[in-house]
Every structure is written in structure tokens, then in C-alpha cells.
């Protein structure tokens, strides 16, 4: 089975995130995608909205998609979340006979060498890298450009930022075109104040 793992803060999840999931399912022949809202990120300050809110939003968006699972594996774990540790847990749960893929943005690929056990990660899974429209000039390490376990997709996903959505909600601006309508009211309620 081909399993893609899509971790992120999803603070909140938006149409751009959904387009990535749709693209991977439709074009990369995945059997399953596991969406993982991060608990305490290893590479950022912990200024995330409540974990249960982010998890609830993700679950609502994908509740009718049998190929998408929303997991609380990182939210439930104590301490900082590291992709390597999460992947090992998922391999234990689903079995090492499956083929695992990690979905990341090009900005994350640029910093991949700073990730915990990144070399082992590259042996355990393949990376599907999406390019941001505004990140065309990011320099990618030659080790990654020539690595068979890193798939860089030239297509561009929607250039939407969760920060932009949070700011619009605080300023009582319309977010209809940025988020799934199933969760619009929930996002407006939960993100109206910090």
C-alpha cells in the first residue's frame, strides 16, 4: 500500500492544503493519505491554536473521503513533534511492507538537513515536494535534486497562508474563498481572538 503522510500546523487548514491532498490522490496513485496536525512543532515557537480545534477542522473537511485519515498521533504525544519519530510510529502501526511518502513544501526541503535523523528519513520514505508560487528562487541542495527518494513537483499549489486567514478573521474580513465552506463558521468562531 502507498501511504502519504501530510503533517503540518494546519492553523487553520485551507483550500491550498486541500488541493495538495486532491493532487496527491488523483495523480500519484496513493492508497491513503494521513493528515497529521502537529502537536508541538520542533522547528517553530509553539503559538498554535488549540490542538482540538485544528484536529476538528481537518476531520470535518475529510470526513467523507475514505482514502484520507486525520490522525492525532502528534497531538497526543508529549514533547516536540519530529517527523522521524512519527514516521517510525506509523511504520509500526501500518507495517514496514508499505511504501511511505512525506508531503512537504519546497521551503521545508530547503531545511531538511536540519531535521532529526534526516538521512534515515530519506531511507524510510520518499518525499513529495510541492513548490509555492512565491518560492521559485529557493536554492535546493544538489544532494536533494539528485536523490531518487525526493520527488519535486513542478505544479504549483494555491498560494494561501493560514496567517492570512487568521488575520482576516480577526479583522472580520471574508474568508469564503480561502477555506472549505464546511468549516468556515467554525474557523471564524475559533480564530476571532488569539
PLM regions: where:
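Nucleotidyltransferase catalytic core that binds NTPs
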Residues: 1-194
